[in-house]
């Protein structure tokens, strides 16, 4: 008999994903086979499973916390916004279609049966399922077709714990208002509340906790302090809140251009964890100063973001910085933008558009999306700041719709191993000042990251930093720190009791 618990929130970015990862880690530490599950995820941060399926990064890092391999069943529906009104719909790891919000709302009832079948399939293989909702269950305009909050809790017949963020203020109003807007049968599913991101003396909350418990009849299971742990974020809310300001002084400063449709900014978590690196996300041209490397990240709408670069003045700022001798790197969509030409006869209908011209490449968009995990080897000879990375093994994943062809003056950056064949990827100029690749997750390869950071150090006349830093070990420590804090501040025994009292056969 499988046990389950679902975390829902009073709003987006209250910490559901991180707390769900913490529960996965706790149950894993306690010897239970545990899997995460989120029926529908809207995010531009995605990853690839070993069998080439695309899913949300949040469920990938939750699976890592649970000590298991990510499985697309943990996130059967992924929505990737392509504009303010449209999103790409990814079902069971493969692109299905593009839809606007109204069309998707009408489409959702058809997904219920498939989602339930996937959930039941997953539940048969694990002792515990930790479910995560999206946004808030009190979105009363979406209630009738809900498949991700109370609608999913009903399908799974599981109890709900409500997570509220005190850091943004109004936590008791958020708790009370959320519960008040639920139907009685939905409120009855809520068995506890966790107050998250508290700073200060928790004794100041005691009277408020007593009152909210009296008003709602729902116990507060704990108050989680604001934690200084390095864990992935599900979407761009953290960027909007300047979580990654990176004010601490470090030897190396890397600027990442914060594109309107930025995707997979989790590419840079391992880079930010380096002890001598400061990451800055840049939105304005005047902020692009005193940097050692500029990175154009992935994008869900390459041509729209390329137009924004030009309209905002960021394109001129990037080109000026490059002329001053600062290397510029592009990943996936950013790689496409660095080229001479982008040909789109598939998505936008814009035809041929000029890129930034730092790489002599031509990119043609395609109908089919490439989604695969790959092992690769950096080219045997690389120039400039990349020289120390020559010949190093790296690992990552591809998520792109298009092919980039190198022209005169560009060299292949690396060789991928795909289906038993060697495939060229990426481009680098003779001076090394422009470098692009389709490979996401590149900086998770410790030796590569240290080599290129030391290459940047050498450009500044700094000695190389020899370190045994391992990003995989770093992530494991963060999961353990999170679990330890949750055991200290949340009544985990009560959560076990809640699950046992609502245990359902699968």
Curated annotation (Swiss-Prot):
Residues 251-448 form the GATase cobBQ-type domain. The gene is cbiP. This is Cobyric acid synthase. One of its GO terms (biological process) is cobalamin biosynthetic process. The active site is at 332 (nucleophile), 440. InterPro entries: Class_I_gatase-like (IPR029062), CobQ/CobB/MinD/ParA_Nub-bd_dom (IPR002586), CobQ_GATase1 (IPR033949), CobQ_N (IPR047045), CobQ_synth (IPR004459), GATase_3 (IPR011698), P-loop_NTPase (IPR027417). Pathway: Cofactor biosynthesis; adenosylcobalamin biosynthesis. The keyword Chaperone does not apply. SUPFAM superfamilies: Class I glutamine amidotransferase-like (SSF52317), P-loop containing nucleoside triphosphate hydrolases (SSF52540). Keywords: Cobalamin biosynthesis, Glutamine amidotransferase. Catalyzes amidations at positions B, D, E, and G on adenosylcobyrinic A,C-diamide. NH(2) groups are provided by glutamine, and one molecule of ATP is hydrogenolyzed for each amidation. It comes from Salmonella typhimurium (strain LT2 / SGSC1412 / ATCC 700720). Belongs to the CobB/CobQ family. CobQ subfamily. Homodimer. The keyword Ribonucleoprotein does not apply. GO terms for molecular function: ABC-type vitamin B12 transporter activity; catalytic activity.
